[in-house]
């Protein structure tokens, strides 16, 4: 009989979790089965996100600017079911705001209009136009230039006992004439050793003598020999006139200057520099050509000076084109070829002065560095938007500068020599299905672990541009549940949420999250 009573007691105890009273508390007062609702607050720290902006001081273009993230916060609302003692399933929604990140901009040129305007805010850059210096154009060689080339002399060899000059040193002026007028390099990289330079192969092993003489000797061009040099100049001159451009030299020069002005116009607007828009007339005189070249020199130098000191190792070298046609040379051209041809010769000389000009090439390289700067990119896009009609306010450059300074001052983001600019300003709504399991359970509290997966909708602004993004997230938590009353628990947990996709293909927003909530069991 006692055995029967013990068995009955055991069966009664085993059936207890499935009885109606088990929805409340078990033998130890721990909640076992039943539905519940939970509400709470959440806060955290964003991690895994970095600025998409490159550090302009990094010549390798690999280092990104530092990014300072804010502390997001929000609330949670969930409904769930205790499906078995120590196991819960939950469907919850979490709202997070203040997912902000600031990018730290480098030092600017204090007090310069370019630096102040560069901090102007606006829509992010849409498309970065490529900056490439104008390609060299081989111009026809005039008779006066031919004669000048023929008369180009060489340096005398050093006296006995002194260091002897090389062929390249003695013929330096002739080599320069070949490059400037014909685009021919006397010395070229060695195909066998890229670090070495050799005489251009087209000037070597030239067949000598009459065609009917055999064997025919071969000889390298002797650039020091005046007769050989004269024949070379005449041949190059004839070839340049046979292959001359279909348009006039004045038109070629005008197009080159127009291209340069077009490339620098956006930067000039940021620096509040006016870029001339009138091209050279086809009938431009020699004086007009000289004036146009001086105008180009002044604009480029003013632009360089405006950004001097804004970036490290950039805009340091003064621009001096030094283009000037000597009066005697001009008169000689007019006497030999007439006024129109003299204008063409002057324009051709100006084109040669721009061909491969190291100062202009360096300026373009510096502008490419400047183009990567976050503040400059934003200012350029702001100007582009205004030109397209996106911004009808027609705010002047000075007004934009004042507005930018006022906004920086109000936000407290302006520091001596450095500025912080909001790159991300986002909010997030996350819906997840989660499972929890108790690892330690007592009458008064329990320690649990959990994991979930769901969908996150992120929205807000990135660099002033409105964005919306939906992606998959997963999370894991570790927490403690405290029984504060019958059917009421306080859950405190911390965890990590991972995003499987990037916003705008640039930003992966992950977060460490702490949550505190009240769970009420029905």
Curated annotation (Swiss-Prot):
The chain crosses the membrane at residues 67-87, 470-490. It is found in: Cell membrane. It is a multi-pass membrane protein. Keywords: Cell membrane, Membrane, Signal, Transmembrane, Transmembrane helix, Virulence. It holds the Pfam family TSA. Residues 385-417 are annotated as: Disordered. Residues 1-22 form the signal peptide. Residues 398-417 have a biased composition (Basic and acidic residues). May be an adherent factor for rickettsial adsorption to the host-cell surface and a determinant of virulence of individual rickettsial strain. It is the major outer membrane protein. NCBIfam families: Orientia_TSA56 (NF033390). This is 56 kDa type-specific antigen.
């Amino acid at each position: 009989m006692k055995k029967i009573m013990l068995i009955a007691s055991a069966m009664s105890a085993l059936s207890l979790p499935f009885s109606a009273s088990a929805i409340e508390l078990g033998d130890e007062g721990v909640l076992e089965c039943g539905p519940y609702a939970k509400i709470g607050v959440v806060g955290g720290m964003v991690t895994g996100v970095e600025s998409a902006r490159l550090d302009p001081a990094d010549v390798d273009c690999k280092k990104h600017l530092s990014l300072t993230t804010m502390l997001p916060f929000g609330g949670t609302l969930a409904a769930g079911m205790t499906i078995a003692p120590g196991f819960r399933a939950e469907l919850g929604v979490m709202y997070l705001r203040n997912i902000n990140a600031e990018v730290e901009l480098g030092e600017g040129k204090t007090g310069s209009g370019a630096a102040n305007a560069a901090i102007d805010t606006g829509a992010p850059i849409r498309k970065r136009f490529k900056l490439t210096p104008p390609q060299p154009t081989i111009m026809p060689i005039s008779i006066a230039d031919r004669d000048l080339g023929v008369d180009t002399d060489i340096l005398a060899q050093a006296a006995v006992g002194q260091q002897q000059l090389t062929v390249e040193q003695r013929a330096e002026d002739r080599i320069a004439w070949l490059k400037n007028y014909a685009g021919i390099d006397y010395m070229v990289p060695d195909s066998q050793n890229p670090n070495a330079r050799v005489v251009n192969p087209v000037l070597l092993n030239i067949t000598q003598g009459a065609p009917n003489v055999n064997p025919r000797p071969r000889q390298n061009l002797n650039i020091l020999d005046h007769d050989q040099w004269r024949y070379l100049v005449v041949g190059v001159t004839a070839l340049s006139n046979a292959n001359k451009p279909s348009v006039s030299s004045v038109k070629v020069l005008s197009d080159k200057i127009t291209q340069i002005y077009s490339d620098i116009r956006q930067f000039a607007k940021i620096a509040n520099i006016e870029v001339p828009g009138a091209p050279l007339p086809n009938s431009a005189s020699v004086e007009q050509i000289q004036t146009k070249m001086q105008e180009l020199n002044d604009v480029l130098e003013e632009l360089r000076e405006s950004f001097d000191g804004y970036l490290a190792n950039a805009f340091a070298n003064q621009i001096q084109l030094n283009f000037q046609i000597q009066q005697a040379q001009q008169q000689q051209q007019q006497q030999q070829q007439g006024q129109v041809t003299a204008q063409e010769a002057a324009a051709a000389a100006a084109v040669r002065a721009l061909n491969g000009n190291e100062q202009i090439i360096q300026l373009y390289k510096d502008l490419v560095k400047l183009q990567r700067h976050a503040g400059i990119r934003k200012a350029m896009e702001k100007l582009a938007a205004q030109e397209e009609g996106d911004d009808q306010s027609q705010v002047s450059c000075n007004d934009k500068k004042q507005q930018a300074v006022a906004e920086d001052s109000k936000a407290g983001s302006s520091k001596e020599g450095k500025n912080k600019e909001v790159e991300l300003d986002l909010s997030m709504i996350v819906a997840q299905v989660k499972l929890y399991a108790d690892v330690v359970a007592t009458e008064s509290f329990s320690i649990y672990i959990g994991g979930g997966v769901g969908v996150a909708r992120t929205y807000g602004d990135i660099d002033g541009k409105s964005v919306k993004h939906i992606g998959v997230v997963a999370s894991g938590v570790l927490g403690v549940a405290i029984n504060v009353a019958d059917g009421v628990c306080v859950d405190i947990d911390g965890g990590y949420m991972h995003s499987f996709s990037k916003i705008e293909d640039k930003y992966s927003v992950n977060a460490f999250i702490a949550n505190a909530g009240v769970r009420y069991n029905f």
